[in-house]
C-alpha cells in the first residue's frame, strides 16, 4: 500500500529587537540567570505590558516578504496554562486574529536517489506575535530544577504552514528557505544553537492522496535541520508500523531524542479549547494602517527570488548558480562586489569561484563569507589575470589562490604571480620552438596520434606543459600542436 506523508511546520523565530515584546528588559543572549527580567516578565502585581513597536514592524516585514495580508486590526490573547517558567500563568499570544494572514514561500527541493530536484510552493496559514516563556534548568541542581526568566517575554513570530509538505526532504527545504529569509530580512539572527529559530513538526500519514488526513503528532523544539529530518523520518515509520500492526495513532506531543534517533511521548496533544484563549484586557487591539505598512514596505531589501532572477537575466547565470548565490545576503553581496570590480563579463567565472574554491576554503576554516581572507576586490584581481591569459585557471587554483588565502603579499594576485614566477609564456615563437623539440623527442606518440589514437595527443600536451614548467597557455599549446600535426 502506498502511504502518503502529511507535514505542517510551526516555526518560532525570535525577533531581533534589543528589548522584549512587552517590557524594556534586554534580549541579549548569555546573561547570568534572572538578570534580564523586568517586573512585567516576573508578573509582579500592578504592572502592565507595553507593546514593542519594533516587534510589530518585523512581523509586517515578514508578511510583506511572503505576500501575506497584514491585518489592519489584530488582537492579543491570553493562552492559559501552568508551567514553572511561566510566571503569569498565561502566555500573551495571538489567536483569532493574527497580524500576518496567508502568504506563500517557494522552496527548492534537492533531488535524491537519482530523482531530480523540483520547486514547490508552500502555503502559510498565519504568522502571529507572542512572548517566549522562561527556561527550566535541570543541571547543577541536585534533585531540583532552576528557573531562568531571562528569556521570558522575548518576542517571537510563530510562523504556521498549511499541511502542504509530503516528505522530510520538503520539510527541511522549507525550513532552510524560511531560515534564510528571516535572516535576509534582518528580523531574526537565525541562531539555532541559541534557540532563535526552532521548529515543531506536525506529522501524520494517510492511505494515499485522496484519503482523509490521519491523526497527527507534534514533534516539539527541533533546533537543527538534521534533527528535523531524522525526527520526521522516524515518526513516519513509527506511525505506519503502528497502523499496519493494527494499532491506532494517538494525537500527542512528542520529543525527539537525537542520541537514540527516535521520538518519544511527552504529553497528550492539547486542542485550542484546552488553553481557554480570551482577549488580553491589558492590551488594546493592534491597529496597523496603510501608511505604516507602506513605510515598512519602503525599507524592504531586494528579496532572494527577485535577486536570483536578476542574476539570471543580467549575468546569464544558470538558475542553480543564482539560487546558491542568493542563499544568504552575505554571499549575494560578495558576488555582486566581485562582479562590480571584475566586470559583468567575468560574472560566471566569479560564480564558479565563489561556489567552488571560496566555499570549500570557508568550510574548512569554519568561516562565514563576510569573514573571508580574500576580499571581493582581490578575487576580482585574480579573475582578471585568468581572463587576460597571465595565468591559467589551474595555476590560479593550485598556486595563487592558496597564497592569497594565507595573506601572502596582502592577498594581491599580481604580486604573488610575480614573486612565484607563475606568468604564462606569452612568446609564441619560444613556445613553437619548445613544441618542435617535444615532437622530435616523442616520435612514437606522433605516430600513434596519426594512427588515430587520441590519447597520444594528450600525452604530447602533457610533455609540452612539462617542458614549459606549466607556464604555457594550455589552449595555445593545443592549437600549436594541432597545427604542427596537421589536425587543426
From Swiss-Prot:
InterPro entries: Asn/Gln-tRNA_amidoTrfase_suB/E (IPR017959), Asn/Gln-tRNA_Trfase_suB/E_cat (IPR006075), Asn/Gln_amidotransferase (IPR018027), Asn/Gln_tRNA_amidoTrase-B-like (IPR003789), GatB (IPR004413), GatB_C_1 (IPR042114), GatB_Yqey_C_2 (IPR023168), Gln-tRNA_amidoTrfase_suB_CS (IPR017958). Belongs to the GatB/GatE family. GatB subfamily. Keywords: ATP-binding, Ligase, Nucleotide-binding, Protein biosynthesis. It is an enzyme of class 6 (ligase). GO terms for molecular function: asparaginyl-tRNA synthase (glutamine-hydrolyzing) activity; ATP binding; glutaminyl-tRNA synthase (glutamine-hydrolyzing) activity. Gene3D superfamilies: 1.10.10.410, GatB domain, N-terminal subdomain (1.10.150.380). Its EC number is 6.3.5.-. It holds the Pfam family GatB_Yqey. This is Aspartyl/glutamyl-tRNA(Asn/Gln) amidotransferase subunit B. Allows the formation of correctly charged Asn-tRNA(Asn) or Gln-tRNA(Gln) through the transamidation of misacylated Asp-tRNA(Asn) or Glu-tRNA(Gln) in organisms which lack either or both of asparaginyl-tRNA or glutaminyl-tRNA synthetases. The reaction takes place in the presence of glutamine and ATP through an activated phospho-Asp-tRNA(Asn) or phospho-Glu-tRNA(Gln). GO terms for biological process: glutaminyl-tRNAGln biosynthesis via transamidation; translation. It catalyses: L-glutamyl-tRNA(Gln) + L-glutamine + ATP + H2O = L-glutaminyl-tRNA(Gln) + L-glutamate + ADP + phosphate + H(+); L-aspartyl-tRNA(Asn) + L-glutamine + ATP + H2O = L-asparaginyl-tRNA(Asn) + L-glutamate + ADP + phosphate + 2 H(+). PANTHER family: GLUTAMYL-TRNA GLN AMIDOTRANSFERASE SUBUNIT B MITOCHONDRIAL AND PROKARYOTIC PET112-RELATED (PTHR11659), GLUTAMYL-TRNA(GLN) AMIDOTRANSFERASE SUBUNIT B, MITOCHONDRIAL (PTHR11659:SF0). Heterotrimer of A, B and C subunits. The gene is gatB.
Amino acid at each position: 500500500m502506498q502511504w502518503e506523508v502529511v507535514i505542517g511546520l510551526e516555526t518560532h523565530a525570535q525577533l531581533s529587537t534589543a528589548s522584549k515584546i512587552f517590557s524594556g528588559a534586554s534580549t541579549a543572549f548569555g546573561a547570568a540567570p534572572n538578570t534580564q527580567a523586568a517586573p512585567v516578565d516576573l508578573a509582579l502585581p500592578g504592572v502592565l505590558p507595553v507593546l514593542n513597536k519594533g516587534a510589530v514592524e518585523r512581523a509586517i516585514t515578514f508578511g510583506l516578504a511572503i505576500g501575506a495580508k497584514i491585518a489592519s486590526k489584530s488582537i492579543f490573547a491570553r493562552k492559559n496554562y501552568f508551567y514553572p517558567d511561566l510566571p503569569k500563568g498565561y502566555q500573551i499570544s495571538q489567536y483569532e486574529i493574527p497580524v500576518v494572514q496567508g502568504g506563500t514561500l517557494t522552496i527548492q527541493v534537492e533531488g535524491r536517489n537519482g530523482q531530480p530536484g523540483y520547486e514547490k510552493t508552500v502555503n502559510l496559514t498565519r504568522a502571529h506575535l507572542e512572548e517566549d516563556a522562561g527556561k527550566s534548568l535541570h543541571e547543577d541542581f541536585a534533585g531540583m530544577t532552576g528557573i531562568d526568566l531571562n528569556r521570558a517575554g522575548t518576542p517571537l513570530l510563530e510562523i504556521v504552514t498549511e499541511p502542504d509538505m509530503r516528505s522530510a526532504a520538503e520539510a527541511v527545504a522549507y525550513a532552510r528557505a524560511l531560515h534564510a529569509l528571516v535572516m535576509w530580512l534582518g528580523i531574526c539572527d537565525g541562531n539555532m544553537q541559541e534557540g532563535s529559530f526552532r521548529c515543531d513538526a506536525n506529522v501524520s500519514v494517510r492511505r494515499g492522496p485522496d484519503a482523509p488526513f490521519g491523526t497527527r503528532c507534534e514533534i516539539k523544539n527541533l533546533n537543527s535541520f538534521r534533527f528535523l529530518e531524522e525526527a520526521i523520518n522516524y515518526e513516519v515509520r513509527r506511525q505506519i508500523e503502528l497502523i499496519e500492526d493494527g494499532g491506532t495513532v494517538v494525537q500527542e506531543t512528542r520529543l525527539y531524542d537525537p542520541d537514540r534517533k527516535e521520538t518519544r511521548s511527552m504529553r497528550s496533544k492539547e486542542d485550542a479549547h484546552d488553553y481557554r484563549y480570551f482577549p488580553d484586557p491589558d492590551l488594546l487591539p493592534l491597529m496597523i494602517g496603510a501608511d505604516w505598512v507602506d513605510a515598512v514596505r519602503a525599507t524592504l531589501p531586494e528579496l532572494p527570488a527577485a535577486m536570483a532572477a536578476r542574476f539570471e537575466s543580467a549575468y546569464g547565470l544558470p538558475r542553480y548558480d543564482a539560487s546558491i548565490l542568493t542563499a544568504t545576503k552575505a554571499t549575494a553581496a560578495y558576488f555582486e562586489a566581485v562582479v562590480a570590480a571584475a566586470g559583468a563579463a567575468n560574472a560566471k567565472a566569479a560564480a564558479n569561484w565563489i561556489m567552488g574554491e571560496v566555499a570549500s576554503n570557508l568550510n574548512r576554516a569554519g568561516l562565514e563569507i563576510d569573514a573571508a581572507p580574500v576580499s571581493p576586490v582581490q578575487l576580482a584581481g585574480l579573475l582578471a589575470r585568468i581572463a587576460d591569459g597571465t595565468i591559467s585557471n589551474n595555476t590560479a587554483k593550485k598556486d595563487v589562490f592558496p597564497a592569497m588565502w594565507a595573506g601572502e603579499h596582502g592577498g594581491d594576485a599580481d604580486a604573488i604571480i610575480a614573486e612565484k614566477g607563475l606568468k604564462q609564456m606569452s612568446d609564441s615563437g619560444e613556445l613553437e620552438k619548445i613544441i618542435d623539440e617535444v615532437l622530435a623527442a616523442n616520435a612514437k606518440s606522433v605516430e600513434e596520434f596519426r594512427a588515430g589514437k587520441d590519447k597520444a595527443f594528450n600525452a604530447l600536451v602533457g610533455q609540452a606543459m612539462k617542458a614549459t614548467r606549466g607556464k604555457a597557455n594550455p589552449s595555445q599549446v593545443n592549437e600549436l600542436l594541432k597545427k604542427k600535426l596537421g589536425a587543426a
